[in-house]
């Protein structure tokens, strides 16, 4: 469906393009602020929001995820993975999260401390989590997961500290 934005690039093909045409040269001047959300941090917000079936999903610093009613801005739920603050010493370039992915009723999140987490998109409840890095090394995860042919793929960070990519 054209109005959905299910991953960082919009579609699973990562086109970074919306075919919708309601906003154009003639209508752009009529745009205004409908609502906004404040977060409990002043750290950088780098993730692309997702829009699915009337809900906006946003990831923020410390790997938190929020769901909002797109029309009203009402917060539907918040997920906090309780990322340990001590992980900050392993991070070179900011306590950030660069996005989430959605697939078949779940929101997928890579946490700063290296977990891949599946969150129920309707309730915000954690369904499962899996450690994806060697916790004894200087790994972190800041990138958005991708879904490819039903498989969730996540990369790691930490090259500044001599860890290997895999």
Feature roles, as predicted:
Residues 1-39, 74-89, 125-134:
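Aromatic (tryptophan-biased) beta-strands that constitute blades/sheets of beta-rich domains
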Residues 2-9, 44-64, 89-115, 140-161:
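Repeat-blade elements of multi-bladed beta-propeller folds
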Residues 31, 43, 66, 72-73, ...:
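N-terminal export/assembly segments and adjacent metallocofactor-ligating motifs
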Residues 162-166:
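Structural motif
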